[in-house]
């Protein structure tokens, strides 16, 4: 696995998995352009502040980014304790808007990696809804569809991670065929990051305790970052349209 001389855009770069991806990629010789609402505490080649839930902010960001990059790592996200409108904007609509805007700039052989979640595993149960949302082409159309098909606060995090997985699947073959760009998801389980406590609030202590009994421990952020870096590298050049669990086997315990 080698990222030498590649240019990566990493969102959510200021903490957690995003920060670890940036550190690892730079160690491997990549140029890393970070994006976040907050200033990072690590060395990057470039950094841009942006609100990834606001299409105007995303459009302004795209204007500042290089004309050619090798990979986009969509890591920024908010927990389900945020209002449902914010979860929709940051975890799905904004991510999609940024990715669509950058697709023409991603070099042939390039890669897009979306961070989903083990909590998105139930996407088959709402497949038709997720496919209908994926068929909306713009941020505004997606907002209008969601206004007509409201999502419950209690399950909004799961819903939009499911939707992200389905959207990734649906884009993968056409983008690979027409642009030679791969797009994949990684699906972490619990990870030691600043928002881990939000998941206790969101899911409840009983669910957290049950999952805790099924797994050895939460992941360290670097354990997920290494998988993302692999998916950005040429070593993964024939991996496309997958949702790769990075959960220490947690999902397998539900079979």
Predicted regions and their residues:
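C-terminal helical subdomain
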Residues: 97, 153-158, 162-165, 185, ...
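N-terminal Rossmann NAD(P)H-binding glycine-rich loop of SDR-like oxidoreductase domains
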Residues: 11-23
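Rossmann-fold cofactor-recognition segment
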Residues: 42-56
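Short, small/polar-rich loop/turn modules that mediate ligand/substrate recognition or access, typified
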Residues: 177, 182, 239-241
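Conserved SDR Rossmann-fold cofactor-binding beta-strand/turn motif
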Residues: 116-117, 182-194, 232, 245-247
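Catalytic loop of short-chain dehydrogenase/reductase
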Residues: 79-80, 85, 108-178, 190-192
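A glycine/serine/threonine-rich, flexible loop-to-helix segment
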Residues: 126-136, 178, 191-213, 253-255
């Amino acid at each position: 696995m080698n990222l030498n001389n590649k240019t990566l855009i990493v969102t959510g770069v200021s903490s957690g998995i995003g920060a670890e991806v940036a550190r690892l990629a730079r160690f491997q010789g990549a140029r890393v352009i970070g994006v976040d609402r907050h200033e990072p505490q690590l060395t990057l080649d470039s950094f841009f502040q942006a609100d990834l839930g606001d299409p105007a902010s995303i459009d302004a960001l795209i204007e500042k980014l290089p004309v050619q990059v090798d990979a986009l790592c969509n890591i920024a996200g908010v927990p389900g304790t945020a209002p449902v409108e914010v979860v929709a904007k940051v975890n799905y609509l904004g991510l999609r808007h940024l990715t669509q805007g950058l697709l023409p700039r991603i070099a042939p052989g390039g890669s897009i990696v979306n961070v989903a979640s083990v909590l998105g595993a139930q996407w088959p149960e709402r497949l038709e809804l997720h496919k209908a949302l994926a068929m909306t082409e713009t941020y505004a159309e997606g907002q209008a569809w969601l206004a007509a098909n409201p999502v419950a606060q209690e399950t909004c995090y799961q819903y939009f991670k499911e939707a992200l997985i389905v959207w990734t699947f649906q884009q993968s073959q056409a983008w690979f065929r027409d642009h030679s760009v791969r797009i994949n998801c990684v699906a972490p389980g619990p990870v030691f990051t600043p928002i881990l406590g939000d998941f206790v609030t969101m899911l409840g202590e009983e669910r957290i305790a049950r999952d805790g009994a099924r797994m050895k421990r939460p992941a360290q952020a670097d354990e997920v970052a290494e998988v993302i870096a692999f998916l950005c590298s040429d070593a993964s050049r024939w991996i496309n349209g997958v949702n790769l669990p990075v959960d220490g086997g947690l999902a397998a315990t539900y079979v």
